[in-house]
Amino acid sequence: HHSNYVPWHFLRKSKNIKIKFAEINEDGDIPIENIEKEITEKTKVIAITHLSNVTGAVLPIKEITQLAHSKGIVVVVDGCQGGPHLKLDMQDLDCDFYAISCHKMYGPTGLGVLYGKKKWLEQLPPYQGGGGMINEVKKDRISYGDLPNKYEAGTMATAQVIAFNESIKFLESIGIENVIKHEKELIEYGQEILKKNNSVKLIGNPKERGGVLSFTVEGVHPHDIATILDETGVAIRAGHHCCQILHDKLG
């Protein structure tokens, strides 16, 4: 996803870091051996999605983290799709960072959640300066506040935080197990229907699939399909899904 790739691209420009890509297989999964073969003694970070918003693949974050940590590598997880669609246990996953987008959990826009292990959050410098994130300010020195205030510069988006709390309550009232069960039923039904049409090509057949089912229709532009379905009251996402590199790979 561009949100995971573009920041690293910025660092490639400013810090001259090297970015490598682990290849997907024909099912849309990233086998752990494909990740392992890209690792060298210089590898510092593995940044990876938990649930692909293109193929629907749920990646084995726990196993990937175990591999990474055995080699002293930090694991950063894009959990924007995983947050609302998977049962999460950070202690079990053991990743170093996990990022969530609140609006994908029925919350407000412009707000996100970053889980990070305390040892890293204490070591890393603030990414932004302002009021609220400092402990003491003198002419010649500044000391930063304790966690999490160290990373909360400026006026907090209080209304959005309160709204997101209500979103969490809403999801908890449904139960993540019920969400997963319902999505599984919808995906299986969708696959059953779409496979009957020879003009439809399903994208990806991952070992473990989240609530995403992607497809193309032979001879019809995706935006036209989206428009036609919209007229019947069905909303779908058409385009490159903010994943142009993956779309290029899939053809």
Predicted segments with their positions:
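Pyridoxal 5′-phosphate
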Residues: 1-251
